[in-house]
Amino acid sequence: MSVGNLHNWYSSAGCEIEVGRTGQISDQQDGLRWPAFYRVQDNQAAKGLWLGAKNFYDPVVDKEYEHKVVHAGPRHLDIVGETIPIELTMYGRYDHPNVFVDGDPSTNLQYLDEVDFVNPDLISDRKIYNEVQTSMGVKMKRTIYSFAHPEHQNYHIQEYVFINNGCFDKECEIEYQQAIEGFQVYLQYRYAISREGMIYDGNWLPQSAAWGHNTMNDVIGEYPNNPSSNDQFYDDGEIIRGLFSWHGYHSSADPPENLGGPDFGGDGHLGAAQFVGVTTLHADTSPSDNSNDINQPTTTWFITSDDPTTSGNQQYNGTKSTKEYVNYMTVGHPEQSHAEIVGTGNANQFNDPRTGSNPGGTSQGIGFGPYDLEPGDSIRIVLAEGASGLSLSLIHI
C-alpha cells in the first residue's frame, strides 16, 4: 500500500511477520515507511497476531484444550493449517499514473501500487480487503484504508472483524459449531527506527538497533476511569488509547547522545527522528453490543522481542498455549510501561522483569477481550497505525 507519505506491505495471512515479504535478513526493517517519499525510511521489524480461547474443543485432533492459541507471527507462520489466506485484494479510487521512458517504466515504484479494482466511490484512496480462515473456527476479515490527502497521509486505518463460523480449514471441510469462551485478540508490534542509519544502509548506528534493540515503547489511556498525567484526549474529551515507539539510547552508540539517530561521522543529520504507534479507535463491547468499549484493550504489557514465546509456536501444544494465553495475551496492564521503567537509561540494556533477559529488544503488545462468541457471532476492532516526526528540513539543520 503505497499512496500518501506512509507505505506498508500487508500479508494475505493477516499479519506482517519478521522478514515476511522478502525473506532477506537485510530486510529486517521492512515496512511502515515514513516519510515514504525518501528511501530507507522503514520502521517496522515484525508483528504478531495471536487469537486465543479457553475450554476449547478442537475437532482436528479430537481434543479438549484448557487454552487454544493460533498464531501469525512474529516469526511463526503456517498458511496451510493455522492462519489460512482466503483473499487479499487491493481497491483504488483511481489507478496510479503510468510513466515510461523509451517504453520502459521510469521507476520501480510502478510495481508497488498494483490496484486490482478501481472504484471511484471509495471513501479512501486505497483499500485492502483481506480474509483469513483460522484453525480455531474463527474467520478474520481485515480491511485497511490509506489516504493521499496531505492531512491524512501518515496513518492507515485497520479494521478487524472476527466471526465464529465453525470452520477449521479453507474449504470448511472440517466444521464444528461451538461457543467460543474467552476469545482474545492479541497483537505484537516490534518497531526498529529507522532503517536509514542501520547496518544494511547508512551503517552509522549500532548493529542491534536494526532489530529494535534500543526501541522505546510507551502506552497511554490504559485506565480511562483513572487517567494519568501523561494521558491525552480527543477534542470531544474521549481518552486516547494508544502505544507509541521511538529510537532510544543505546550503550554502543558513539558518541552516546544518539536520540534521533544523528550521523555524527557525516553531516550530522538525524536518521531516526520518527515516532510510530497505534491507537484504538473502536472495540466492540460484546457480540450483542457494538458500542465502543473504552476499557479495551485489556492488556498492554510489553514483551521482549526474543522471548521464547515469539518463535516455535505450536497450536496443538496445550502447555504452550496456556502460557501464551495466561502470561501474555490476558495479563492486563503493567504498573509501569516499558519506557517508564527504562527512563533515561539505555533501552538495549533493559531486562524484562519476567524473564530476566533481553537480547533482542522490546516489542509492545495489546490484547482485546475476552469475548464469548456463540456460533455466528462476531466482534469488531478498529485501529489506526501511523508515523510522524521532524520534517526533512528540520533533521538537516
Task: Report the location of each language-model feature.
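A long-range scaffold signal marking pre-active-site subdomains of enzyme folds
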Residues: 1-394
